[in-house]
């Protein structure tokens, strides 16, 4: 069957095929690099955390893309003005309790953040699922959210120092301020 082609034609075909393969591989590598840069820029430290958790950048990128797809389907919504005001009043009460009952206030702040997330359309679920979901819209808050939650739910929370509790409240305040101002993307 190849008898109809000259050696020069076969060599030209082989070279053309090799060039096409090289172009395809280079194109794929450029695509992957761009995707990695984009996800790293979008998710920040959460990207690095996903790589550590999943063992490879490829697996982490798949999981982060899955998060984005999941969150797009959640039906997130803005708070009504009355809801926003109710959450602000509740937050102020939690903050006021911190002076006399810091451990209780930190636990209440954690619960209030969870309630606020549900009001915004995020589903109830485990902390890790909530964290994964909100990392799509608020990746820069994740480190604060994880640290504050670790103190709020720590067994033996009584061992948390006043300074740790104060930092947790500040972290929750940062999260609260961002979430209560949420505007649907």
Where are these regions (language model features)?
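Elongated extramembrane "stalk/tether" segments
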Residues: 34-137, 141-160
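Intrinsically disordered, low-complexity N-terminal regions enriched in serine/proline/glycine
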Residues: 27-30, 46, 144, 171
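N-terminal signal-anchor transmembrane alpha helix of single-pass membrane proteins
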Residues: 3-38
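Extracytoplasmic/periplasmic C-terminal soluble domains
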Residues: 150-185
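Residue-identity detector for glutamine
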Residues: 9, 92-95, 129, 171, ...
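Intrinsically disordered, low-complexity segments used for protein-protein interactions
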Residues: 2-3, 175
């Amino acid at each position: 069957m190849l008898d109809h082609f000259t050696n020069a034609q076969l060599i030209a075909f082989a070279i053309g095929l090799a060039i096409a393969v090289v172009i395809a591989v280079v194109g794929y590598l450029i695509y992957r690099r761009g995707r990695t840069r984009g996800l790293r820029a979008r998710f920040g430290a959460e990207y690095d955390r996903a790589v550590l958790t999943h063992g490879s950048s490829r697996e982490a990128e798949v999981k982060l893309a899955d998060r984005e797809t999941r969150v797009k389907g959640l039906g997130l919504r803005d708070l009504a003005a009355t809801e926003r005001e109710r959450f602000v009043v509740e937050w102020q009460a939690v903050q006021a309790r911190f002076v006399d009952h810091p451990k209780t206030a930190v636990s209440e702040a954690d619960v209030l953040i969870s309630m606020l997330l549900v009001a915004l359309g995020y589903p109830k679920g485990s902390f890790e699922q909530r964290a994964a979901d909100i990392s799509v819209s608020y990746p820069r808050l994740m480190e604060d959210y994880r640290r504050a939650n670790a103190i709020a739910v720590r067994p033996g929370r009584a061992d948390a120092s006043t300074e740790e509790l104060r930092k947790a409240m500040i972290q929750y305040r940062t999260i609260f301020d961002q979430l209560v101002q949420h505007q649907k993307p």
